[in-house]
Amino acid sequence: MLVLGIETSCDETAAAIVKDGREVLSNIVYSQIEIHNQFGGVVPEIASRKHVEKISYVADMALKEADIDIDKIDAVAATYGPGLVGSLLVGLSFAKALSYARKIPFIAINHIEGHIYANFITYPKLKPPLIVLVVSGGHTNLIILEDFDRYEVVGKTRDDAAGEAFDKIARYLGLGYPGGPAIDKVARHGDEEKYKYPLADVEGYNFSFSGLKSAVINHVHTLNQRRENFKVEDVAASFQKAVVDTLVEKTIKLSLESNIKRVAIAGGVAANSKLREELSKRCSEHQIEFYVPDFKYCTDNAAMIASAGYFKLIKGQTSSYSTNAVPYISLVSKKE
């Protein structure tokens, strides 16, 4: 079964064709990073206009790369939220129109949920149950995936998401956009033990990063006021360590307490080298299987959306054309 995935939630225009939810035949991504970098972040109006310009071209390229005629597509899946409303509407409208014109099913996908399915692309034989840590620019969730399309959200951020904290600290340190890769890069040359930044003691499996963000900003401000010399690399490395430590600690704790010895990560922050390294090491220490998507499936892409669409389709879960873009939507526990 062939599903065409469409992803336009932020600043990437993406289309992909995935066979049976796991085999990627094409994965096309048009990135706007260079355009938005000059502004220090994504400009919503520019992002949506670029999506309008590129969506047809990107979808056509996905078909060509897969060497698939559009008549062979069984369904089309698109992100409906969360994200920038103007950007979401472009991909959603395109997918609905294609579905209507070709008389094929349309499936609306939660972007955060889509990230989870990137693991089933990288590991075709992987099956639930497993623990999934979803870490992206706007969301941080700790999930027990009981079955395909059935999961329990046991932890989430109370304020800033991990990726959001990375972006804000990177901007404050003058490292540019996107912040995650920028901090990851400079932190490799810093001393992560140089500064001890506090993390909020949040109950259960929840997270909080706003206090850490403020602590780093105030610390750097104080150093500048006192005209004390410091290395940006040390600040970046120490900040990154604090974030990674809390993500890893709670993920391992959930795996051990739930007795689910499979852990996967997903989302843009899953590309962070420190997070991948530390979680892999801790999983190995506790004989826990560790899964992480290929780098190209960590950041926003349409292959993960197509994969998620397939697993909904085989359960008969299609969407109505009245489905609208929802810019602010969380991942909530889903039971059959």
Curated annotation (Swiss-Prot):
Its cofactor is Fe(2+). The keyword Zinc does not apply. CDD domains: ASKHA_NBD_TsaD_bac (cd24133). Its EC number is 2.3.1.234. Required for the formation of a threonylcarbamoyl group on adenosine at position 37 (t(6)A37) in tRNAs that read codons beginning with adenine. Is involved in the transfer of the threonylcarbamoyl moiety of threonylcarbamoyl-AMP (TC-AMP) to the N6 group of A37, together with TsaE and TsaB. TsaD likely plays a direct catalytic role in this reaction. Fe cation binds at residues 111, 115, 300. Transmembrane segments: none annotated. GO terms for molecular function: iron ion binding; N(6)-L-threonylcarbamoyladenine synthase activity. HAMAP family: TsaD. GO terms for biological process: tRNA threonylcarbamoyladenosine modification. It is found in: Cytoplasm. Keywords: Acyltransferase, Cytoplasm, Iron, Metal-binding, Transferase, tRNA processing. This is tRNA N6-adenosine threonylcarbamoyltransferase. GO terms for cellular component: cytoplasm. Its main location: cytoplasm. Binds 1 Fe(2+) ion per subunit.
